[in-house]
Amino acid sequence: MKTYSFFVLFIVFIFFISSSKSHSKKHVRFLCATKAVKHIRKVCPDMCLTGEEVEVNEFCKMGYSDSQIKYICCPE
């Protein structure tokens, strides 16, 4: 009986772990925003010289190409 109970609890535990999310949405947005800012600084080292801000949330949702970032931030 103890073995059967342990086995059932073990299966329920595994099911619970597999169905839970590994990261919250807030954590994922934070990671994306951090990576986006680092990438923008790599493309435009002086950040936005035009005074125009690259919308980090849009960068995370849609993705900007390097040429779009240069056009917005540091046109030549």
Swiss-Prot record:
Could you identify this protein by its name?
Probable insulin-like peptide alpha-type 1
Which cysteines form disulfides?
Answer: 32-60, 44-73, 48-74
- Entry's localization field: Secreted
Q: What is its main location?
A: secreted
Q: Which residues, by range, are in coiled-coil regions?
A: none
Keyword Disulfide bond applies: yes
Q: Does the keyword Signal apply?
A: yes
UniProt family annotation: Belongs to the insulin family.
Alphabetical keyword list = Disulfide bond, Secreted, Signal
Q: Which residues form the signal peptide?
A: 1-24
Q: Which domain of life is it from?
A: Eukaryota
